């Protein structure tokens, strides 16, 4: 089924891909993305590991409706998480050469 050394080469390629994925995951975890809502009135800085580092709120919002502010903060967090997911997919495509993971399968395996 596998030619001479074929299985060994396949295993070596799999190991190399695994190492590249681990490095990519470390890079993503260190990255910081900024999500926004309310046309930039609320900004959330989040790491690739989904840790919120900073929340910025335009001063005039502090005097406005509390419920609206809560919604804007949640929307900014969701925007940052979406940006992180997009970056993870792009980085994964670099590592896998564009090969898509099966539906429902996420990194790390």
UniProtKB/Swiss-Prot annotation:
GO CC annotation: bacterial nucleoid; cytosol
* Subunit structure as annotated in this protein's UniProt entry: Homodimer.
Family the UniProt entry places it in: Belongs to the YbaB/EbfC family.
Does the keyword Membrane belong to this entry? no
State its role: Binds to DNA and alters its conformation. May be involved in regulation of gene expression, nucleoid organization and DNA protection.
- Show the InterPro entries listed in the entry: YbaB-like_sf, YbaB/EbfC
UniProtKB keywords: Cytoplasm, DNA-binding
Gene3D superfamilies the UniProt entry points to: Nucleoid-associated protein YbaB-like domain (3.30.1310.10)
Location comes to:
Cytoplasm, Nucleoid
Q: State the name under which the record lists this protein.
A: Nucleoid-associated protein SO_2014
Q: Does the keyword DNA-binding apply?
A: yes
Where does the record locate the signal sequence feature? none
The molecular function terms of the Gene Ontology recorded here are: DNA binding
């Amino acid at each position: 089924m596998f030619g001479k050394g074929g299985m060994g080469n396949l295993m070596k390629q799999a190991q190399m891909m695994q190492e590249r994925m681990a490095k990519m995951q470390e890079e993503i975890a260190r990255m910081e993305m900024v999500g926004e809502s309310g046309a930039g009135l609320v900004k959330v800085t989040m790491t690739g590991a989904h840790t919120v580092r900073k929340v910025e709120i335009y001063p005039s919002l502090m005097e406005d409706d509390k419920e609206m502010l809560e919604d804007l903060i949640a929307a900014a967090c969701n925007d940052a998480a979406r940006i992180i997911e997009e970056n993870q997919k792009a980085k994964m495509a670099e590592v896998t050469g564009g090969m898509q993971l099966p539906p429902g399968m996420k990194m790390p395996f």
